[in-house]
Amino acid sequence: MKINIFYQTDIPKYLRRTGLFQTACLQALKNFRREKAEVNIVFVNEKEILRVNKTYLNHHYVTDVISFNHERPPFDMGEPWSFGDVYVCYQVARKNAPKFEHTILQEMMMYAVHGCLHLSGMDDHTPEDRAEMDRQAEKIIASVLD
């Protein structure tokens, strides 16, 4: 599986830790690795995440992360295929990091990993499910940052 990272907003260079994001996301997707599958992690600003949220989910607010699963092609065409996209709002991560006692990098990683956990089939519809996703994300991030 290949993890593509795109920075579509102004993010300080010291936070553009592509290798760390790729490693963390691969761990979150460990049960769904497909050789030719690709996942796109797209860091965006508040305006863009609002646009995506309105356009595709009919939600009229800024959020931290949005993930979209893509259907697997019905047969192997021998070419890479998109497993999913994860949109992460950098500005929300920057604002929320102090509240959760994270660095900005940790908060960005939380959102990217959270989105990948959704792609892997986890949900956060209940407080218990959300807590489990947070535990999984924290565990992955701790292992990557050690």
Q: Which residues does each PLM region occupy?
A:
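An acidic/histidine-cluster motif and surrounding catalytic segment
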Residues: 1-108, 120-146
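Short active-site segment of divalent metal-dependent hydrolases/proteases
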Residues: 113, 117-121
